[in-house]
Amino acid sequence: MNLKETFHAFKESDNFFVSLARDIITVLLAVLIFASFSQVVFGMWTPMVAVESGSMEPHMNVGDIVFIQSIDRTQVVTYEEGMDNYNSFKNYGDVILYKPYGQEGVTPIIHRAMYYVEEGEQMWEGGPAAPHAGYITKGDNEMTNRYYDQQGQVSYMMPVKEEWVIGIARYRIPYIGYLRLMLPGF
């Protein structure tokens, strides 16, 4: 039997184990294609996160899947800079995904980059000097995020260093993230 005949027999077989192998190969190919596409377009193998809180409402909701573009592929546009002619998710500037305090293994925060401060510069009007350069960030939800992250528990007194930024939110798909939120550790 030549290769063409073997492939045809594999493709047409009704045997349970052959059918199972076919399904597994199909899923693996789909994952490989998606991962390759993600790497090319977004610069990341897994370019998405599920929104876990309402801090970005009404522009991102709990359960949304958000596609993230690697910070290596783009530059952050802050709210302050975006006021001229740029917005994302119905507001000025970029929404960034960052590691709080640069820590690994903690849930990343997805909030809007409001402006950039240099070391020693006031972090906000009447506020303390920045201990290092970085972004001042804030969630879009005015009910839950009245203050900058750096004024509260999210990133207290610490501007978000550029190396803490994982990427920039580019697209969202509503509700799909609930699947990920229902499966802890996934």
Role assignments for model-derived ranges:
Residues 2-17, 46-49, 72, 84, ...:
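Extracytoplasmic/periplasmic terminal helices and flexible tails
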